[in-house]
């Protein structure tokens, strides 16, 4: 079996791209430009549709996707994700909480460790929390969590992130054959309809298009390493 590429801790943008990443990024940009923005508009519709969904159901574990830290502390966006995961856990929708996210930027803690400390300070027992602290981005979050999930004999995840991120996270999880339901942290900034919100929606639409372009590109060129990374 070909070992998939994983970015090192505190990876640069080019390191995070990995083998084939720059090519698929270029293809994604070219298809958007060459087709007058239609692929981007289609993905934007998916991103905005995902804002409204809340697919609550009991699961084996709740998964909180990480976010880059500021001064070794969760940002408001990450805090909103964590608080929503805590609320779902207290409602009894799952008995364990996965927190995913490695060491990024200048942080001394991983995103998962900072998330654990935040939840423990709010009274969540440390024994409830499982950490995935090796990843550098959403794809690696889910790839590593999949291995941990299988090792524990679990199947279902209730995935938590901010609303604009969930369409891409859901697509990535399904590409990895994960059985996920999604619940958005609706109070996560930026405020809905603000300029920052619109900019984030536009970016997420392109990132979602890039992900799907990468899947198609990997299959066309028959790259086992690329396919092992995304499926």
Regions found by a protein language model. Name each.
Residues 178, 229-230:
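Secretory/periplasmic and organellar redox-cofactor proteins
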